[in-house]
């Protein structure tokens, strides 16, 4: 079932609810930069077969969510939107444990939510989380983006990561030709995503305490595996696990071995439920 969750007069989040009878738990999915919920159909189906209900939504500025396309005013909007989705899901499913899965920028959103709201979920799963400054904005380029993104917020910047998302050519081709994928975003958006939000994480990373599974492809060219390793080493969680996948690129859930990875995620969720 697809519908819209109204946040305010200017923003309504498009979401999909794929629920099973008597779910063992619920998983809320935060997709990555430029993505939309349609790219997680196979993930949803896999979780449903394992007895897990799934809620996913197009992040602000993305997909078919009703908001300015490719733009946000502040990274804090991602945290507040995510919180509204969590409250909505919990109100609809009283007493059912809730987990959150975030990929790439969605992993950043998930991590920030975990820092800001440490008591709402049973645990989180992060896939290639973009929680630190990435190669395109290191050094002088980051300084330029910081200035341009602050002073000329509405200038558009092209999505330059398209060829590096996955080692499966069909996935890359589908991504490039997907009308719901963002192929550009504003400088203001990129500043909030690539600079301001990672600064928030760096400042508050030790406050993150959720049980967490972090998964990362060793050949990730978009978010280097060192970023995931840094997060794992610096969060305050006692219950944490890091899995590195040799030969996999950024979108591990679109690589050919994705069923095995999803099985691992399901097993981890069920393990948390037994504790």
Where are these regions (language model features)?
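Catalytic nucleophile-loop/oxyanion-hole region of alpha/beta-hydrolase
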Residues: 34-37, 63-93
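N-terminal cap/lid segment of alpha/beta-hydrolase-fold proteins
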Residues: 1-20
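Catalytic active-site module of serine/aspartate enzymes centered on a nucleophile-bearing elbow/loop
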Residues: 241-275
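Alpha/beta-hydrolase-fold enzymes
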Residues: 103-186
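Active-site glycine-rich loops that stabilize anionic/oxyanionic intermediates
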Residues: 24, 31-35
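Short beta-strand/loop motif that positions the catalytic acidic residue
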Residues: 208, 214-216, 220
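Short alpha-helix in the alpha/beta-hydrolase fold that links the catalytic acid
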Residues: 224-233
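Conserved alpha/beta-hydrolase
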Residues: 39, 44-68
